[in-house]
Amino acid sequence: MEQIYHYVEEHHSEEITLENISSELGLNREYFCRMFKKNMGISFISYVNQVRIDHIYRDLIYTDDGIQEITERHGFYNQKLFYKMFKERYQCTPLKLRKIASETE
């Protein structure tokens, strides 16, 4: 699992598919999916999206870059899906997060 975590951290801004990660690890795609979900409790794609959203969260706080620029930098091109997942994870919108962060400085 450590190898998978490292791979996702290093490549989160790139397109990561089940095919390329399972191939990289020399595993069958279906076996990889089952193994990952059994160990992590979530699907591999959900995990990749969480890693991306965590990186985006940090950039929203520590940079003044535009939201779309940040999301694309970290491999998230579907803005509607990003906003939905971000709000589920952090219970606020990216703009609200920035406002809160700027008020606490």
Regions found by a protein language model. Give the residues of each.
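The DNA-contacting recognition helix of HTH DNA-binding domains
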Residues: 29-30, 34, 78-80
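Non-catalytic C-terminal interaction regions
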Residues: 88-92, 98-100
